[in-house]
Structures are given as structure tokens and as C-alpha cells.
Design a protein with these regions (language model features):
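A short, surface-exposed alpha-helical micro-motif characterized by mixed small hydrophobic
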Residues: 102-103
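Walker B catalytic acidic pair
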Residues: 64-66
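H-loop/switch region of ABC-family ATPase nucleotide-binding domains
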Residues: 95-97
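Phosphate-coordinating catalytic segments in nucleotide- and nucleic-acid-processing enzymes
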Residues: 1-57, 125-168
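Loop/turn-to-beta-strand initiation segments
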Residues: 58-59, 89-93
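Conserved hydrophobic alpha-helix in the ABC-type ATPase nucleotide-binding domain
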Residues: 77-78, 82
């Protein structure tokens, strides 16, 4: 929870009856004026504080698009927190469409710390219309998918623009 407080620059305080505030060293704010990404961090902190998430004891943590509404600067610390929870026995299942979250997972995964991240890419077969699942242990082995294609298109466009159309 200290890591979460460090990310947010303060602590979420739960008074009961639904009243939640965010407290820094000098001020206290209604959680309603906090950015959504910080509120997500506060919720994670609260789940840990109450024991709803107990690494190695509680069931899996399912989190759909944890990066949604998150300040991009907070993505790396979020991944570090998730990996630390995992190292302590918490199974975490994420769904994302975000290249940067995937890349931070790839860069911060440490096999020496026995990190185990498995990537699953879902796609629709264009002929049979069946859903395919490709599962790999290495980010670089993920088959081409909408995330990698969109990021590749963006990169190609930026390179083309910066080179003034050379090579066309």
C-alpha cells in the first residue's frame, strides 16, 4: 500500500457510509474530485487494506483495462505493483487493448524473481469466424493482433511523416 500512496502522493481515507477522501500532508479532498486513475489506485489500496485481496490466499484478481483513465506516467508503477502482488502469490488476470501496458509488463517481468506472465491474444478467424486464442509466455511471441497492428500503423505513419515521404 505504501507504493500506491507514493504513486498518488497521498492516502485514501475511508470513513464508512460511503464517505471517501484523499489526504495529502496538508489537505483533504473529496474522492469525487480525484482523477479516475487515482481512484482506481485507491480502490486497489482499499482491497488490500481490508483483506479482500490477500496474496496467496484470496482468489484471482480480475481487472479489465487497468490502464483506462490512468495517467500514462502511472502505468509503470502500476505494473510494478501488480508484479509485486504476483510475486507474493496473487494470481492476476488482466484484459487490455493497450500496447504500453503490455510493453511495461514485458520490460519489468523478471524471470530471476520467478515472474510468470502469460499473454493471450484473441482474434477472429476471417474464414471460419471462430475465435482463436494464442497463448505464449514471451511477449515477443504474440501473434499479430489488433494492438500490435495499430501500434505498427502509428509508428509507420510517424516515420513516413518525419522522412517527408521518402521511400514511397
Amino acid at each position: 500500500m505504501d507504493e500506491i500512496e507514493k504513486i498518488c502522493g497521498g492516502k485514501f481515507v475511508f470513513y464508512g457510509a460511503g464517505k471517501v477522501t484523499f489526504k495529502t500532508n496538508n489537505e483533504e479532498y473529496s474522492v469525487n474530485v480525484m482523477a479516475e486513475g487515482f481512484r482506481k489506485a485507491g480502490l486497489l489500496s482499499r482491497l488490500l487494506e481490508t483483506g479482500a485481496i490477500r496474496p496467496g490466499i484470496s482468489g484471482p484478481l480480475f481487472w479489465d483495462e487497468p490502464e483506462a483513465n490512468l495517467n500514462p506516467k502511472l502505468m509503470q508503477p502500476l505494473v510494478e505493483i501488480l508484479l509485486e502482488l504476483s510475486r507474493n502469490g496473487q494470481q492476476i488476470i488482466l484484459a487490455t487493448h493497450n500496447y504500453f501496458l503490455l510493453k511495461w509488463l514485458d520490460l519489468l517481468t523478471n524471470k530471476g524473481k520467478e515472474d510468470h506472465v502469460r499473454y493471450h491474444a484473441l482474434s477472429c478467424d476471417p474464414v471460419t469466424k471462430e475465435i482463436r486464442v494464442d497463448s505464449v509466455d514471451n511477449y515477443h511471441q504474440i501473434s499479430s493482433n489488433a494492438i500490435s497492428e495499430a501500434f505498427g500503423d502509428l509508428t509507420d505513419f510517424e516515420i513516413d511523416r518525419s522522412m517527408g515521404g521518402l521511400g514511397r
